Amino acid sequence: MQYINIVNEGVKQLHPYQAGKPIEELERELGITNIIKLASNENPFGLPDSAKQAILAELDNLTRYPDSNGFYFKQTVAKKFGLSPEQITLGNGSNDLLELVAHTFANEQDEILFSQYAFIVYPLVTQAINAKKVEIPAKNYGADLDGFLQAISDKTKLIYLANPNNPTGTFLSAGEISQFLNQVPAHVIVVLDEAYTEFTLPEERVDSFTLLKKHSNLVICRTLSKAYGLAGLRIGYAVSSAEIADLFNRVRQPFNCNSLALAAATAVLHDDAFIAKVAENNRQGLKLLEDFFTAKGLNYIPSKGNFVMLDVNQPALPIYQALLQKGVIVRPIAGYGLPNHLRISIGLPEENQRFLLALNEVLGL
């Protein structure tokens, strides 16, 4: 029996996600030590103490199922951002929520719109449910909002829009997003993916939650994997109208967030000092890399995230491999249609310096 012949039609075109090898295995294979990973946009500071303490306090409760509704976590999010708990949906990371939106609203052959050079999960989710992918050509490596508006049809059900965008780091202002939402028909759900919003400068940051008061078709997805340092625990949340959140909770798996994730996330949302430290390290590190690229005449896309996309002006895979031999892992992004580019996550100061030294040697600058 060839089981591929009986699966959902969309699944036939998919391939399993290819994760990188563990650092320990790479060190063994390459015969080197002290590899640094600047590939996955993770928090270089590791787990904050506030989260560690919350996890330790929760250990004795692990024989019980987690709180399926995330009562204390939702209360914390609601208080922090001036929301109602009924507007919040729990996710096993924001990827879970991006998929949940599609399963809730889209049917086969509905159209789902997303930008060229946008997060690879958007087309994967669309393909998996056998909906129709509509990729909008990018404008200066970012979302062309006019292009989105022109592409909307009666069959359009969802729009995925990242701000800042991964992997390019481009950014849409509050005015641009507001004007765009004013022109999107009510039957189209707009998913605003804000996985990297904490890295934007406070004076530039979009207060997206206020947009919900006017736009009931808006869903905002956030994660605690990036700035908050909880990538291994898998927790995120969506904010929407209470009506849409109720629909999500009809589809969402119960207990999709484990007890340790809920405890750690609740604690770190109170940890403003940690987030301030993370944001300042990112600001300085991003400036260091971008100043270096400018001084060396290298092309890059100015970023508002915790990463920067570099054009090495040649196939990037050999550059990636040469950097790996020097103990520095970055991300080649040919899978996004950018074969000459690398995405580099911002690390600790000493990691950023080590990357620049390795890049200087590899490129012969």
Curated annotation (Swiss-Prot):
Annotated coiled-coil segments of the chain: none
Record has Transferase as a keyword: yes
Modified residues (N6-(pyridoxal phosphate)lysine): 226
Pathway annotation: Amino-acid biosynthesis; L-histidine biosynthesis; L-histidine from 5-phospho-alpha-D-ribose 1-diphosphate: step 7/9
GO BP: L-histidine biosynthetic process
Family under the similarity heading: Belongs to the class-II pyridoxal-phosphate-dependent aminotransferase family. Histidinol-phosphate aminotransferase subfamily.
Catalytic activity: L-histidinol phosphate + 2-oxoglutarate = 3-(imidazol-4-yl)-2-oxopropyl phosphate + L-glutamate
Keywords assigned: Amino-acid biosynthesis, Aminotransferase, Histidine biosynthesis, Pyridoxal phosphate, Transferase
Quaternary organization: Homodimer.
HAMAP family: HisC_aminotrans_2
UniProt organism field: Pasteurella multocida (strain Pm70)
SUPFAM superfamilies reported in the protein's UniProt record: PLP-dependent transferases
Classification via PANTHER family: HISTIDINOL-PHOSPHATE AMINOTRANSFERASE, HISTIDINOL-PHOSPHATE AMINOTRANSFERASE 2
PROSITE patterns the UniProt entry points to: AA_TRANSFER_CLASS_2 (PS00599)
Keyword Isomerase in annotation: no
Enzyme class, spelled out: transferase
GO molecular function, one term: pyridoxal phosphate binding
Cofactor(s) demanded: pyridoxal 5'-phosphate
UniProt-listed Enzyme Commission number(s): 2.6.1.9
The protein, known as: Histidinol-phosphate aminotransferase 2
